[in-house]
Regions:
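C-terminal nucleotide
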Residues: 28-35, 43-56, 62-204, 215-225
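DPxDG-like acidic metal-binding loop motif
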Residues: 11-33
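FAD-binding core of FAD-dependent oxidoreductases
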Residues: 8-19, 56-68, 204, 209-211
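A short, flexible beta-alpha/helix-coil linker loop
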Residues: 6-7, 175-178, 211
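Short beta-strands and strand-loop turn motifs
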Residues: 2, 172, 206-209
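Glycine- and acidic-rich phosphate- and metal-coordinating loops
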Residues: 1-9, 36, 40, 44-47
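Residues that form or immediately flank small-molecule/cofactor binding pockets and catalytic motifs
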Residues: 4, 50, 210
């Protein structure tokens, strides 16, 4: 297997591979003529991701790899997006439930670019997710920060569908700062984010953090890079 994505870098490479393998196996087992069941592929890929991450995995990457386009994952059904399906997972902390949506983007969003900066630091998702789970167990009041990230993400989805790039960038900055406060950033990520922000609308770590990559939203990709 070869990939142009950085591994263990928060870019969803393992989810893309899981979804592709599930789709290939389903195609092999089927008649090869009918359309593949995207929800079932996403379900199987999510289970595979969870098995590799100590029973904890968001369906965001596997749903995006399966559906393509822009995907919104929420703890509720969002009126501003097209609902696709519900995913549940039994985790060490109890059952989790997510609502998966597709989002239509306005043409104005095409004016912006995403610049990816790699730290070169490998950070297994399972390790970082377990770290945050441990923090929340020791300090339950930190769930307020998780809830705030959820609120900002919902606001970001609204800004995205409205094509408000400035608002999206501002929200990215705020979410990154909250994630850093939860201990999932690292010096290398902070250096990349600081370097990108002067020429971008916003920048944040991507994936579980601890290394991997950061994303910068910019209308000047050459300057940001």
């Amino acid at each position: 297997v070869t990939s142009e994505l950085f591994p263990a870098a928060g870019l969803g490479s393992s989810a893309a591979l899981s979804a592709a393998i599930c789709a290939a196996l389903m195609h092999r087992e089927g008649d090869g003529d009918g359309e593949l069941d995207l929800e079932h592929i996403s379900h199987l890929a999510h289970i595979a991701e969870a098995e590799a991450q100590s029973g904890r995995a968001s369906p965001t990457d596997t749903s995006t790899a399966t559906l393509g386009g822009c995907v919104l994952v929420s703890d509720r059904r969002e009126e501003s997006a097209e609902w696709r399906w519900t995913r549940t997972l039994d985790t060490p902390e109890g059952e989790r439930c997510w609502e998966i949506h597709s989002v239509s983007l306005p043409e104005s969003v095409r004016e912006a670019h995403l610049v990816v900066g790699s730290t070169g630091v490998h950070a297994p998702t399972s390790k970082m997710v377990a770290k945050v789970a441990g923090l929340l167990k020791r300090q339950p009041d930190r769930m307020d920060e998780i809830a705030r990230i959820g609120d900002l993400s919902r606001a970001g989805a609204g800004a995205l569908t409205a094509g408000d790039l400035v608002a999206i960038g501002r929200l990215m900055d705020e979410v990154h700062d909250l994630l850093a406060g939860l201990g999932v950033s690292c010096p290398e990520l902070e250096q990349l984010v600081a370097a990108a922000r002067p020429t971008s609308l916003g920048a944040k770590l991507t994936g579980a953090g601890g290394g991997g990559c950061m994303l910068a939203l910019t209308t000047e990709p050459e300057a940001t890079a």
